[in-house]
Amino acid sequence: MTVSDEIRARYEESEQVAVFEWAELARAEFPELEYLNASLNGVRLPIGLAVKAKRLGMRKGHPDLNLPVPRHGYHGLYIEMKPITRGKKEPKKPRLEKDQRRWRDFLIIQGYCCLKCHGKDEAINIITNYLGGGCDAHTR
């Protein structure tokens, strides 16, 4: 892992922590946020624990966040969080990797809202819109 990869991973981690801090505060308005949960795919594990996690069912590419609450014809919400990185002229938005696209496509076919977001603010907007307004799983 390069230094820039490590920085990007730590940024994504801090953004995800901020989403859960917001969710805890927003539970008065949206009690369903009690069930917002995360996969541990983004966690860097020592090799022994990584092997154990894989044996226990961790799957590469699985989205970072899951809210198992049906809304607007969807069975639930999945979110893949990506960091915003700085390019030469404007922020670059990382793309989904092959395994992440495969999960996204599968989940959409199965009736879930599955979106990619860049940073905590976008994740919070997606969750708020999903719980209150709607979700367009085919735009991201």
Regions found by a protein language model. Name each.
Residues 1-140:
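Catalytic phosphate/metal-binding cores of nucleic-acid and nucleotide-processing enzymes, i.e., regions
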